[in-house]
A protein has these predicted regions:
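N-terminal auxiliary "cap/dimerization" subdomain that precedes the catalytic jelly-roll/cupin core
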Residues: 1-65
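Mid-sequence acidic-hydrophobic segments that form the walls
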Residues: 58-69, 108, 115-118
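Active-site environment of non-heme Fe oxygenases that use a 2-His-1-carboxylate facial triad
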Residues: 1-25, 33, 73-228, 233, ...
């Protein structure tokens, strides 16, 4: 959380070698022009196991621009099971031990560092969103058309500096030949349940259910479990991700613990104009996304 950011991590472990910059450029290209995923252990980059948090922070700063992930302006978020129930209005999915649904986050790239894996479970599952889109286009072109239209998203309870009750944006979109997928069903469902937000019709609900069912197809999924020191980077416009439920150790020092950073990328793609309200900018390479801090 903020304690990591306040410790001056960006100053204490400089990354200066040409090999590190080669790694940075390779990661950027893989994320935007490749499969949209990059996974590596800190030790294979730095050769040592110490200062992994600092290496992670420095690497992220070279790859892109870290964004605020809360109204407190946290740029490094500590991901642990907070013991909150699923119906708690302040709960954020990553801070539970329950299975998550496939989704994307409000940034170009999401980055994780695993400090401690769970005792069991917590498997990461990733699908290529363009592959999912192609399946839907082939099997249910009628639903594909619906998913390319705007859906209401309820403003998250943790997004306190946002005065808007909801925004509307498509799940599948294309701008200037660049595909993009953005999806977080929990906020769509919350909008549907809110009398002050637009209701979903039956066709929209069917389209969302079919999208979820396609993501469940094992042949489309890449599955693995992050181990201590593993970093994972995902392009949120070209992948959807989730993790399975997990059981923690009793020892608090051994409980599952990840760090998360949201990145705006200098080589990002242009996105549909409808994302401007939620992301702040839609042009290629623009700094966009994140959550506006309450105090600037």
């Amino acid at each position: 959380m903020n304690d990591y950011y306040s410790q001056g991590l960006k100053k204490r472990t400089p990354i200066n070698s040409s090999s590190h910059y080669d790694i940075v450029n390779n990661i950027k290209n893989l994320l935007e022009k490749g499969e949209g995923t990059y996974r590596e252990n800190c030790k294979s980059i730095d050769g040592v196991e110490e200062n992994q948090e600092e290496l992670f922070w420095n690497l992220c700063n070279l790859i892109g621009t870290p964004l605020s992930q809360s109204t407190q302006g946290e740029k490094i978020l500590s991901i642990k099971n907070a013991g909150l129930s699923a119906d708690d209005p302040k709960v954020r999915g990553p801070n539970t031990n329950q299975k998550l649904s496939f989704h994307s986050d409000r940034c170009d790239v999401i980055a994780f560092l695993c400090l401690q894996p769970a005792r069991s479970g917590g498997e990461n599952q990733i699908v290529q969103s363009e592959e999912v889109e192609q399946v839907i286009r082939k099997e249910r072109i009628d639903l594909h058309s619906i998913l390319s239209q705007k859906f209401p998203y309820k403003t998250h309870t943790i997004d306190g500096a946002n005065p808007l009750p909801y925004c509307e944006q498509p799940i599948f979109s294309n701008r200037d030949g660049f595909f993009a997928c953005s999806y977080l069903r929990v906020l769509i469902d919350r909008a549907d349940q809110d009398p002050h937000c637009p209701d979903l019709n039956d066709s929209q609900k069917e389209a969302l259910d079919f999208l979820d069912s396609v993501c469940e197809r094992k042949e489309l999924q890449s599955c693995f479990t992050l181990q201590k020191g593993d970093m994972l980077f995902l392009n949120n416009w070209t992948t959807l991700h989730r993790r399975t439920a997990f059981d923690d150790h009793e020892d608090s020092e051994k409980k599952r613990h990840l760090l998360r950073i949201w990145l705006s990328m200098p080589n990002s793609r242009p996105i549909d104009e409808s994302f401007r309200r939620n992301f702040g900018a839609v042009e290629a390479g623009a700094i966009r996304g994140g959550i506006t801090p309450s105090i600037q």
